[in-house]
Amino acid sequence: MAEQHWTGQLDLTVFNNGESSKARNIFFEKALKVLRPIYLEQSPVPTFYIVNVGGGYLDGDRYRVNVNLEDNAQVTLTSQGATKIYKTPNDHVEQYQTFNLSNQSYMEFVADPIIAYENAKFFQHNTFNLKEDSAIFYTDILTPGYSSNGQDFTYNYMHLTNEIYIDNQLVVFDNMMLSPDKSRLDGIGYMENYTHLGSAYFIHPDVNQSFIDDIYVAVADFQKQYDCRIGISQLPTHGLAVRILTKRTQIIEEILTRVQSYINQTIYHRQINFLRKY
């Protein structure tokens, strides 16, 4: 098998020193970079900004991200800007992200939108390896980019897979394929006349149906205020999945922020930090 040549790769390990979480074993090269951690509002939880220094994903790009959390470590990961997938006439873009969480660790990954432009082909594979008592909050936002004919869905496809393991047992496999060439994305069962899709997972030992019901109450007013649809489902483990359909990125961000705020206040007894990107 030929050796994989990465356009960008990144490795990061976070540990708890008894007072706060710190980073070690940081490695990155080529088109991926991680900035020095920021402790927003004097929080003991570091925030890392992951940067694509090339400004966008191009034809044939391959990316690898590996994040490890040791016992009791906590971290917030985010991007510095949107992930832009430009046209890929010859080869698609691939991104592989692996997150390994040890006992009682917690990772928040709140990324900016993935924007697929005309004739873009994008594949992303995420693997989450958790312990029974570790936790994740992870989000994705998918949006169509500019097209020359003004249509909404002119990318070739966006294919995202998520595998979640708890104590080495596969508990969630989410395989999402958005391919305008093969399906009418504006039809029933797909985007249903919406253009933007938001997703989130929250895995934590305290998640049950009552907790999910409370989150739904916390976000219910958005469906009255905006043209959007929100679905929250219990996963076949102690976790939940959120799906949002709308026509604006900002609406998805508001809803996911409300979900994240409820989680942090209820379970971790703290406020979320404003990530100050703009």
From Swiss-Prot:
Its main location: cytoplasm. GO terms for cellular component: cytoplasm. It comes from the Bacteria. It is found in: Cytoplasm. HAMAP family: UreD. PANTHER family: UREASE ACCESSORY PROTEIN D. UreD, UreF and UreG form a complex that acts as a GTP-hydrolysis-dependent molecular chaperone, activating the urease apoprotein by helping to assemble the nickel containing metallocenter of UreC. The UreE protein probably delivers the nickel. Belongs to the UreD family. This is Urease accessory protein UreD. The lineage of its organism: Bacteria, Bacillati, Bacillota, Bacilli, Bacillales. The gene is ureD.
